[in-house]
Amino acid sequence: MYGAGGVAYVYFVYGMYYQFNVVSNVADVPHAILVRALEPVEGIEIMRERRHSHPDHNLTNGPGKLCIAMGIDRQLNGADLLGDRVWIEEYESVPSRQIAKGPRIGIDYAEAWIDKPWRFWIKDNSYVSRISRKGAKAQRKTQRKT
């Protein structure tokens, strides 16, 4: 996480799950973005095998599930996200009115940062991981504005 932006930061939690993050600042500044979910557009058959044929919307709707489905482990830690092992690419443009934001989840320890709206997702997307009550409220508020 202390490397230059544009690389993967992969770590192991709870003794059983990997988490995939995108390092997002200059070297020595520990900023990273946790990728909590994704909507598969290809490779879904292998994801089903890795996740033991869960319903498609449950294949990647959480950070641990995403890593299992994608075969992500510590070997990808530090990988260049413009390389050929793992990468992020533009797929479709999403209108800003379809992007919801709310507080992050699972960071009860973060005190002053716990309610910051630093979590973003596509509204009504079935692949989104769990949304907190505050996040759902923020999404409804955003929907009323559009």
Give the positions of each predicted feature:
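Short, low-complexity, charge-dense intrinsically disordered segments
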Residues: 133-144
